[in-house]
């Protein structure tokens, strides 16, 4: 086992919890397209990629469109809620979450896995838990 440290890992560590919670709150719970776009510009690299179970979404505008469509599809009181603190190391962070409305708060559950580059999300994998 090597004891050498990659110089890229010596930079200040990413705040995985802050970044991944901000993504959930300010992107995937934000109904205002302008505010959502501003959050994406702050939280994501210039050319991010998001991987969903059946789609690959490329670019900030496309990610914003997916978030907006989800919110529109499930109604005004649908929201994503973190289940624990975001954790990570070596440029990869995770955040467990559930989503739903007040009467059915766990309509869907999953985990976001993000590759962090220079303190921003470069790639995001949305892993959904099986239902039933």
Where is each model-derived feature located?
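C-terminal and inter-domain tail/linker signature
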Residues: 1-132
């Amino acid at each position: 086992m090597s004891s050498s440290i990659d110089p890229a890992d010596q930079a200040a560590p990413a705040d995985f919890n802050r970044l991944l919670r901000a993504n959930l709150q300010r992107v995937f719970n934000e109904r205002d397209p302008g505010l959502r776009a501003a959050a994406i510009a702050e939280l994501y690299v210039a050319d991010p990629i998001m991987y969903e179970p059946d789609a690959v979404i490329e670019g900030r505008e496309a990610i914003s469109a997916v978030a907006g469509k989800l919110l529109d599809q499930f109604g005004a009181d649908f929201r994503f809620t973190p289940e624990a603190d975001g954790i990570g190391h070596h440029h990869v962070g995770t955040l467990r979450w559930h989503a739903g409305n007040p009467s059915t708060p766990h309509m869907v559950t999953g985990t976001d896995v993000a590759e962090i580059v220079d303190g921003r999300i470069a790639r995001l994998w949305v892993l959904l838990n099986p239902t039933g």
